[in-house]
C-alpha cells in the first residue's frame, strides 16, 4: 500500500471514530467513568517521500499507450500474416493453373499424335487393300486370258451385259434424280413434321430392304458365274485331252 493510501485510510478511521464519539455524546447515558482518552493523530508523511499525482497519471497514460501500441502492433502483424497468406494462396492458384494448362497441352499433343497415327495406319491399310485388290484383279485377268476362245467370247458377252447393266444403272440414276423432289417442310407444323418423318423412315426402311435383296441376288449371280467358269475350264481341259487321244499319225483312229 502506498503512502497516500495509508494517509487516506488513517483519515477515514479517524473520522469514523469521531462520528461514533458524537453519537455517544447525543445519546442519554449515565455518566461514564472517566478514563484516559487516547488522542488520534494522522500519520505524517515523511518529508523525503512526497506523492506526485502527476507522475502517477503519466505512468498510467504511458501504460495505456504501451498497451494500445501493443494492440496496434498485434493488429498489423495479423494483417501482415493475412496478406502473406493471401499472396501465397494466389501463387498456389497460379501455379496450379499453369500446371493444368501444361497438362492440357501435353494431352492435346498426345491426342493429335494419336489421331495422326490412326490416320496413317488407315491410309496404309487402304493402300494395302487397294494393292491387294489390284493384284487379285490382275491374277483374275491372267487366269481368264489363259482360257480358250470360247471362254473369251463368254467374257465378251459378260462384259457386254455388264456394260448394259451399267448403262441401265446410269439411266436409273438419271430417272431417280429427275423424280426426286425438293423437301419443303418449312410450312409444316409439329404433327405434320412427325408424319413426314415417319413416311421418310418407312421409305428408307423399304429402300434398305430392297438393297439387301438386290445384294443377295448379286452374290448368288456371282457364285453362279464362278461355278460356270470352273465348269468351262474343266470342259476345255477334257476336250483337249479327248482330241489328243482320238488323232494318231495325222489321222483319226
UniProtKB/Swiss-Prot annotation:
Pfam family for this entry, one: Troponin
Comp. bias (Basic and acidic residues): 46-58, 97-139, 167-178
One GO BP: skeletal muscle contraction
Segments for region (Disordered): 1-58, 97-178
Modified residues (N-acetylserine): 2
Job description of the protein: Troponin T is the tropomyosin-binding subunit of troponin, the thin filament regulatory complex which confers calcium-sensitivity to striated muscle actomyosin ATPase activity.
Family: Belongs to the troponin T family.
Protein name, as recorded: Troponin T, fast skeletal muscle isoforms
Originating gene: TNNT3
